[in-house]
Amino acid sequence: TALRVREEKVELLHTHCPIASAILARSLREVVDAPLVLTYHTKYDIDIAKAVKSRLLQESAIRALVQNVNACDEVWVVSRGAGENLRSLGYEGAYTVMENGVDVPRGRVSAAAVAAATAGYDLPDGVPLFLFVGRLMWYKGLHIILDALRALREQGQAFRMVFIGAGGDEKEVRAEVETLRLSDRCFFTGSIADRETLRAWYSRADLFLFPSTFDTNGLVVREAAASGCPSVLIAGSCAAEGVTDGRNGFLIEENAVSLCAKLTALCADREAMRRVGENAMRELYLSWEDAVARANERYAVVLDRYRSGKYPKHERFSDEFFNTQGDLMEAMSRVAEMRGETGRLCRELREGFDEAREALREKLEKEW
């Protein structure tokens, strides 16, 4: 691979993961004379915490991640919030916000296309339709959606809710819909890969519900905006960047009460949903082509800075890699020692309990 990269005369390396692919990119940079750009997409500390239970190993993994980021010549983040998350992990260098675009055109699809895509679902005319598109995981704010819908139903408000996507929590989400007695108005389509079918759902929906604080960019918000569907988002979240409440989207607090209140008000003002959706289409939409054009312009800046020697020299990857591996192995050793100590204490407690139980039994036998 290294030989082929050298033969291809690569001018720039770009990685989209600060872990595995960043390690590969750093090793390749020692073979080719090219700058390395990294795009930081997601809150890796949350992913690491889910995958690794040991606090020591979590901290070691995050240090390794930050070292990889520091080793890059330029760092891009998909939102200001993503940059703040990276800062919270210990990164102190500069970064550039480079927003992602969407690969769907601006504008709603035809009524016929909407009818074809949504056929078979009970979606009465005049009844507000809410939509969620994404992985069916609780951390996407799905509890907030379901609890708000339950309260909305209890108020007597008619509505329909469609979930598009799949995920590790799908079975639990479906079960919760049954428990809350929402199955007559909540539907699951599964994953939809066809872009035109997705556009049809966005075009049919009155509101896109996305109360997630996990996502660093929320491309689905721009996809919805492309079809004139306004989003309901958590104020201060990454997905809500660029959104003004009541102008090009709707903002709520991170709880079901706030979402229910917003939905109640909007169900009584369908014109507001339409108007804000039009503004979202004009103001939030960013095409993939425009995003790529901006990236290409920035590449030119990176190359100029690299050739001018404006980027600092970085430690050889091999040296830093082995240092990092040493730190990680030390952390693993400390975890093992802690587990061993915990096991020893448990054994001592168990042995002490057995001794006390035996002494008590002997005492009772003597007394009886």
Features from the language model and the residues they span:
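A conserved mid-protein helix/loop that constitutes part of the nucleotide-sugar donor-binding site
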Residues: P128-A151, Q157, M161, G168-R174
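Short hydrophobic beta-strand element within catalytic cores of glycosyltransferases
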Residues: P230-I234
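Conserved acidic donor-binding segment of nucleotide-sugar-dependent glycosyltransferases
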Residues: D245-G246, F250-A256, A265-R270
